[in-house]
Amino acid sequence: MDKERKLIIAGNWKMNKTVAEALDLVRGLKLELASVKEVDIVVCPPFTALSEVSKAILDSNIRLGAQNMSENNVGAFTGEIAAVMLKEFSVRYVILGHSERRQYQKESDALILKKALAVHAASLKPIVCVGETLSEREGGQMETVLQTQITGSLAGLTKDQMEETIV
């Protein structure tokens, strides 16, 4: 029997907010959203703010997410971050396959699948993004592009992993 999923609202702050600005924002969110129970609330600040935001939301209904993660656990991967590192900040969710990373960093569905498997191996929850470009939409390719991304990004996941994956 399929279990009913709780709705989730996730905010990706992208490359916005200094640590001080992130703390101001999350303190305001804590006050405004304190009574919200029917949805899971996730904030995904820049990596530089993860530590402080993690501390600021400890006693709240807000959960922490990361904007990306390496498929590797350790090694000479300059500028990357591993799941074990994210867990030190109490990160619970990781955004994967965002359109900007697909476009500018040329991330493939195969790479996103590897990242999703690494996220699951760390007992975190992946938020796998899919989406077509404007030219693909205007060219009538939306459904094909989305199907290809979904299939390619999730093809190696188990049923249990799929149930923990947000698309």
Protein language model regions, located:
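Active-site loop-to-helix "anion-binding N-cap" substructures in soluble metabolic enzymes
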Residues: 1-167
